[in-house]
Every structure is written in C-alpha cells, then in structure tokens.
C-alpha cells in the first residue's frame, strides 16, 4: 500500500518468481505506477476498507504510513481487511506514528495518548496526507489482539528525521 517507493524495488531485490501488488487511494499515483512499474500489479482503492483480493491471498503485506492517515474506525476496518487477505502464518508490516511523535501533541492530546487512546487530527479529508493519527502502543496492541506481534521496532529520531514505529505481526 502506498505510492510505490518500496514495492517498485522488490521484483529486482527478491527475484524469486513472486508476484507483487500495490494499491493506493490516490488515482494519479496508481495511474503513474501502472505506466512506469510494469513488474507490479496496481489497483486503486477507496477510503473504505475493501480490496479486490480473495481471503488468505498474500504471504506478506506491508503498509508504510497508511494507518497514519485514518480515523479510529478505519484503523479497525483496514486492519481487518488486511488480515482477511493475509494467509495463515503470513506476516504484516505496518508503520505508525508512535512515541517519537508525542512532541507534536498538545497537552490534552498527550494525556489521552498516554492513556492508550488514538489521537486523530483531521481538519482535512480523511485519507489525505495531512490527516494525521498518532498511535500509542496500547492502542496498537489492542488492534492486533488476534495476531502474534513478532516485533515492535522503535528507532531514535535523528537530525531532520523522525522514524515511525514498525509493527511486525503474524496471522
């Protein structure tokens, strides 16, 4: 999921007869990807959590900064949709705006965040790149309660770079 910054490299890196798919909310991005990255099958998705793949279809799914643009309801809807299309024992990698992003929160938001509540700032259309969600560990662990959390990676911020958390889960 996302604008192909990562998936465009996978056919060359992995090169073992795998099939690669990409999906995104942005129609122009998908059109560009279809024209310029023929090794990957792309489709446009809507904001609603519905993908055109059968149950238990993918071995690996990744979403780089996808949940960071969704409401609490769509966190649940999209996680459930990704879980649906992930094969048993499949692995999902998702990035979130965790503790590194607490500095961006107001005092009332920080209090709620520290209580394990998702914080959403949405003065723009949901799904837009400036619609922002901040995901505390407790919220994410509850979201992934039907899966095994293999790892939760938090990296320290660097000058001019604030890394997102990486969650690696297994169905």
Task: Please name every model-derived segment.
Residues 76-88:
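A short glycine-rich, Lys/Arg-flanked "PGG" loop and its adjoining helix->strand segment in the class I
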Residues 21, 64, 89:
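Short glycine-rich loop/turn motifs that provide flexible caps or phosphate-binding loops at active sites
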Residues 2-50, 72, 76-77, 93-171:
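Class I (Rossmann-like) S-adenosyl-L-methionine-dependent methyltransferase catalytic domain
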Residues 51-61:
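A short acidic, Gly/Pro-enriched loop at the edge of an enzyme's catalytic core
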Residues 59-73:
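A short SAM/SAH-binding and catalytic strip from SAM-dependent methyltransferases
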């Amino acid at each position: 999921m996302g604008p192909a910054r990562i998936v465009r490299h996978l056919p060359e890196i992995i090169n073992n007869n795998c099939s690669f798919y990409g999906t995104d909310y942005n129609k122009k991005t998908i059109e560009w990807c279809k024209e310029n990255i023929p090794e990957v099958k792309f489709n446009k998705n809507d904001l609603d959590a519905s993908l055109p793949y059968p149950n238990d279809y993918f071995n690996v799914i990744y979403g780089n900064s996808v949940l960071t643009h969704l409401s609490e309801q769509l966190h649940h809807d999209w996680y459930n949709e990704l879980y649906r299309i992930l094969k048993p024992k499949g692995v999902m990698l998702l990035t979130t705006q965790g503790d590194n992003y607490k500095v961006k929160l107001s005092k009332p938001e920080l209090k709620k965040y520290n209580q394990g509540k998702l914080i959403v700032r949405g003065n723009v259309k949901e799904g837009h790149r400036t619609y922002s969600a901040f995901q505390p560990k407790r919220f994410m662990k509850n979201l992934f309660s039907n899966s095994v959390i293999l790892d939760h990676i938090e990296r320290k911020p660097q000058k001019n770079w604030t890394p997102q958390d990486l969650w690696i889960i297994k169905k």
